[in-house]
């Protein structure tokens, strides 16, 4: 059964799907839930995990959402992101290795929502154009473009949940000489196939996960050399002999790149692994989240409630150690807030802002990686404790992350060959049948082969 309340969810990626599953879970227990409408601009669910060969614009002229590439494997252990209510073993019928390729993770994400039967709540190929809030009626007007029928229309909702992600709008810096660079210049968002760079000398600009993984992919598929450059600190791993880290890029002159230490090098391609922006071009200033990519997002009470309009929620806007299970914790909490099981009416704006400040202060208390992982783990625990989301061993998930960091430090090109224990089933993952550097086929069939 549904109440008269209407809820709009923006996006059917992992966060939006978590929200659909949360409402479906309540409905399955006999609770009355609001009418749910999820708008998704792509023709399928999965968000970033819904791979496309396209770059730039999609078939409808919308900016391509996908930032994933062929041969992408999870860069963190699956034991840190497993759904508490749907294990990898339940989905695949057996335990699988700890670092699955993209296609395997997409299949896992899809399996849970197929089981929950929530697809009818999603309007695919429907891009959100604008959202307004009317103070007099207390309703949001959501204007969308239905590409299937080439129709623009508006509907009203009591609540809006923004689950559109923040890893699809690239941050593209400019360096002197880019205009006359003679090689390939591409942002990680548009990187699709490492084989393109086989036999080439490449420069990777950046020192975070994209730089680490895209550089590693290019190494695996035969790049002649990799140079990566950093603005603040090197990644500092034990790189292969043909990979060197340099300080900040200063300028480019044709195919020569110059660094802040006075050195230079000839390269055939430059890959910008320079991050992404929180970008919401469908929201006015009074509804639009403005935050850096951090663990304690600005202006979000409990990390999800928009303090300037508590009828609006944001999911998954944090920098992330935990992913799918954190999105679940947030989605269950938002569901209960909307359904009145968590009472926001007596929380003042001042109290919400104080909550945000307290979270920021705690985040900034240390720059230690283990501290950051535990910080986000405590956040997940906090939300889970306030809802009926299935409890799971969050500390055990932290241990998987700690081991992952240790294994990366030991051998950055072999860390995916390790295995960890599921915190949901207690089963140790098998070691994958082929070492990562030799596993050139990333298909699900090849991965699941015994």
Curated annotation (Swiss-Prot):
Keywords associated with the record: FAD, Flavoprotein, Monooxygenase, NADP, Oxidoreductase
Enzyme class: oxidoreductase
Cofactors, names only: FAD
Catalytic activity: trimethylamine + NADPH + O2 = trimethylamine N-oxide + NADP(+) + H2O
GO molecular function: flavin adenine dinucleotide binding; N,N-dimethylaniline monooxygenase activity; NADP binding
Keyword Flavoprotein attributed: yes
Entry keyword Flavoprotein: yes
Residues that, per the record, bind FAD: 15, 40, 42, 48-49, 65, 75, 128, 320, 323
One Pfam family named in its UniProt record: FMO-like
Top-level taxon of the source organism: Bacteria
Reported function: Catalyzes the oxidation of trimethylamine (TMA) to produce trimethylamine N-oxide (TMAO). In vitro, has a broad substrate specificity, oxidizing many nitrogen- and sulfur-containing compounds, including dimethylamine (DMA), dimethylsulfide (DMS) and dimethylsulfoxide (DMSO).
Protein name stated in the entry: Trimethylamine monooxygenase
Record lineage: Bacteria, Pseudomonadati, Pseudomonadota, Alphaproteobacteria, Rhodobacterales
Encoding gene (name): tmm
């Amino acid at each position: 059964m549904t109440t008269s309340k209407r809820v709009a969810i923006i996006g059917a990626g992992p966060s939006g799907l978590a929200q659909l599953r949360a409402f479906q879970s309540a409905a399955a227990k006999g609770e009355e839930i609001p009418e749910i409408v999820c708008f998704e601009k792509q023709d399928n669910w999965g968000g970033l995990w819904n791979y496309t060969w396209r770059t730039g614009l999609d078939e409808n002229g919308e900016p391509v959402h996908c930032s994933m590439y062929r041969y992408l494997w999870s860069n963190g252990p699956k034991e840190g992101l497993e759904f508490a209510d749907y294990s990898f073993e339940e989905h695949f019928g057996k335990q699988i290795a700890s670092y699955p390729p993209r296609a395997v993770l997409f299949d896992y994400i899809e399996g849970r929502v197929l089981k929950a039967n929530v697809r009818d709540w999603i309007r695919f190929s429907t891009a959100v154009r604008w959202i307004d809030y009317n103070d007099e009626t207390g309703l949001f007007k959501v204007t969308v473009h239905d590409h299937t029928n080439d129709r623009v229309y508006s509907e009203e909702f009591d609540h809006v949940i923004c689950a559109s992600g923040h890893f699809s709008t690239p941050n593209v810096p400019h360096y002197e000489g880019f205009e006359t660079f003679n090689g390939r210049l591409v942002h990680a968002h548009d990187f699709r196939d490492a084989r393109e760079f086989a036999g080439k000398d490449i420069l990777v600009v950046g020192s975070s996960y994209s730089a680490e993984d895209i550089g590693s992919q290019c190494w695996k598929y035969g790049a002649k050399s990799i140079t990566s450059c950093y603005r603040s600190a090197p990644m500092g791993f034990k790189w292969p002999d043909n990979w060197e880290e340099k300080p900040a890029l200063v300028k480019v002159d044709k195919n020569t790149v110059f660094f802040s230490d006075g050195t230079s090098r000839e390269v055939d391609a430059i890959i910008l692994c320079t991050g992404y922006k929180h970008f919401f071009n469908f929201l006015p200033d009074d509804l639009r989240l403005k935050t850096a990519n951090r663990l304690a997002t600005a202006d979000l009470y409990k990390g999800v409630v928009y303090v300037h309009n508590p009828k609006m929620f944001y999911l998954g806007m944090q920098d992330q150690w935990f992913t799918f299970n954190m999105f679940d914790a947030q989605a269950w909490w938002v569901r209960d807030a909307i359904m009145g099981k968590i009472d926001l009416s007596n929380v003042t704006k001042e109290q919400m802002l104080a909550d945000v400040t307290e979270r920021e202060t705690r985040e900034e208390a240390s720059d230690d990686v283990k501290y950051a992982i535990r910080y986000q783990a405590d956040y997940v625990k906090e939300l889970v404790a306030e809802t009926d989301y299935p409890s799971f061993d969050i500390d055990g998930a932290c241990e998987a992350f700690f081991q992952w960091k240790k294994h990366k430090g030991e051998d950055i090109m072999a860390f995916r060959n390790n295995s960890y224990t599921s915190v949901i089933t207690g089963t140790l993952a098998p070691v994958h049948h082929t070492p990562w550097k030799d596993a050139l086929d990333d298909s699900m069939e090849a991965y699941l082969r015994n």
